[in-house]
From Swiss-Prot:
Binding-site positions, Mn(2+) 2: 57, 237, 289
Name of this chain's protein: Probable protein phosphatase 2C 2
Organism the protein comes from: Paramecium tetraurelia
Note on how the cofactor is bound: Binds 2 magnesium or manganese ions per subunit.
First-level EC class: hydrolase
Amino acid sequence: MGPYLSQPKKDKTTTTGQGKSVIFAASEMQGWRNTMEDAHIHKPDVIQDVSIFGVFDGHGGREVAQFVEKHFIDELLKNKNFKEQKFEEALKETFLKMDELLVTPEGQKELNQYKATDTDESYAGCTANVALIYKNTLYVANAGDSRTVLCRNNANYDMSVDHKPDNPEEKSRIERAGGFVSDGRVNGNLNLSRALGDLEYKRDSKLRVNEQLIIAIPDVKKVELGPQDKFLLLGCDGVFETLNHMDLLKQVNSTLGQAQVTEELLRKAAEDLLDQLLAPDTSQGTGCDNMTTILVYLKK
């Protein structure tokens, strides 16, 4: 059996909500893939003045993405730096905390409960792209190739950069760790250089967590938000395969129009976007992945 279904699963699971400063719609669709391995989080006003959104694109199984979806916010809220409003450090530490939890006996037991197969060991991992809004400041932490794009002055302001093995800095680390990059893949296998999980790439006891073949340490980008900023678009890589960032934002803006933005209007914008991105068939390979997007409208 190949990676694709004979017909795509077009039904969507969409959640909407709002807080003091944001309205959001999060929508996911399995599409042509045999299984759904995306996960996501959305929590406006998780505490006063803080909202959190994130997408996690699983690979090698769904279990790590589901584990992170369940635990990320709880661990972030427990973090000492988070409580002190040191959000950049808190995000970095929470990414690493996910890996720490995964290797515990309790973590392994939970992974086995999520797994779709009966194999003894999980070789799964996931990307992580998390946006934290504190008052008028946006932080985006990224490990992997999911993305956040800010619609600023009706143009794209990119909040993350993909971590790919061919990137010179990433490739250098991989080679120092004793690995190699072939066809854009770590040791010929994984086409990401940073991810949560993927524990078999992180087992060299002589290396620190930031020196392994694959690392969970995110880049964090910070920007001050203003009246020129309209919404965030978070997505797993399946959302970004067929349209460039500017065209994605145009598609969303065409749905929003000049109307007052509501949860239902954002729901329509998110679901219409996934429908447009879904390929009519699998011959080209693009538009065939699981798709998850979160639209976060910034109230004025």
